[in-house]
Design a protein with these regions (language model features):
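Aromatic-lined carbohydrate-binding/catalytic grooves of carbohydrate-active enzymes
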Residues: 164-300, 306
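Short, well-ordered amphipathic alpha-helices
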Residues: 150-153, 200, 311
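N-terminal accessory beta-strand-rich subdomains and adjacent acidic, glycine-rich linkers
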Residues: 1-150
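N-terminal amphipathic alpha-helix/helix-capping segment at the start of soluble metabolic enzymes
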Residues: 150-164
């Protein structure tokens, strides 16, 4: 209804009523009623979303939920503050989502949504939930960003040769997979080198199997392993395999990357086969950079199996 019709908007008794609480990751109760907050929400599914970040500034009052993976809160009295980083997928695709990520009421702040339902939790199994990081910062606009960056640097060693890149992707010419082949890639590599590109990533179309986005044949993201040759170079496009393209890239000082889509059916039950496909490409061609696409994580089991896929690939490669 119309919010103007709300009753007891300033009733002290109404403000003290206890609200039903969902499972939460973290909560803080701090002094002061003049907190200035900013919630930052991110969006994936970039086929549909072109605006990938949304910020909302607010001063907490009545108990209200906000969406996002980041919450910055600054005390209006002295300028110091803290942040919550909810380590989880974007709000729109989280599992067991309670409708918001942060619940704020005056100086009370809670991170909600653990990434699982009651049915997902079993005494016999370890179930990984979403996590939360709390950090503090001082005055100034740069201070919270430096605090957040300090945490990120601590959890992952920065290696320029691995983490810094200028990538060129073959999908950008709007031809889908119709032009991708050995001759095309060799020519594109020459252009990429002139542009200073460090990584050349061949998107959908390099492989023998066909995806539903193929312009040359009707394919699917499901039941990929019905075709055991799905993740091998397409013979009609790459008659010599990927070796000539890999060698050309090395000559030009460019690293070659590939598109890869894990088999999604039955909660990624074929994750071990997907691991072997990626590891084989790494060992045969030295491919280290993969664009992972087409993910659909709708259950906790799917999330668990996908995590096994990523972790096992890391274990089997150096």
């Amino acid at each position: 209804g119309n919010t103007a019709d709300n009753k007891n908007i300033e009733s002290a008794a109404d403000m003290k009523q206890k609200k039903k609480r969902s499972p939460y990751l973290e909560t803080l109760s701090l002094d002061g009623v003049h907190w200035h907050c900013r919630a930052v929400e991110f969006f994936d599914v970039t086929d549909w979303n072109n605006n990938l970040v949304a910020e909302r500034d607010f001063i907490p009052y009545r108990r209200t939920g906000y969406r996002g993976n980041l919450l910055f809160a600054r005390d209006g009295r002295d300028g110091n503050g803290f942040f919550f980083l909810k380590e989880a997928p974007c709000s729109s695709v989280q599992l067991g989502y309670p409708g918001s990520d942060f619940v704020c009421e005056f100086g009370n702040f809670t991170v909600s949504g653990i990434g699982a339902s009651e049915a997902d939790l079993k005494s016999s199994d370890w179930v990984k939930l979403y996590s939360c990081v709390t950090g503090v910062f001082g005055e100034g606009e740069l201070s919270p960003l430096k605090a957040l960056r300090a945490y990120q640097k601590n959890i992952r060693e920065h290696r320029p040769e691995r983490d810094e890149m200028i990538m060129m992707n073959t999908w950008g010419d709007r031809s889908q997979d119709s032009k991708v082949n050995e001759v095309f890639c060799l020519a594109e590599l020459e252009k990429a080198a002139r542009l200073g590109v460090t990584h050349f990533q061949i998107d959908d179309g390099w492989q023998e199997g066909k995806s539903p986005n193929s312009s040359v044949a009707k394919g699917s993201f499901r039941n990929i392993w019905d075709n055991p040759l799905y993740w091998t170079p397409a013979k009609d496009k790459y008659p010599h395999g990927l070796a000539p393209v890999v060698e050309k890239a090395k000559e030009l000082g460019i690293e070659l990357g590939l598109w890869f889509n894990p088999s999604v059916q039955n909660d990624f039950e074929d994750w071990e086969k997907d691991v072997e496909a990626v590891v084989k490409l790494y060992r045969e061609y030295g491919i280290r950079v993969f664009k992972i696409d087409g993910l659909s994580i709708q259950t906790k089991k799917a999330e668990t199996n996908l995590r096994k896929f990523f972790d096992t690939v890391l274990e089997k490669t150096d």
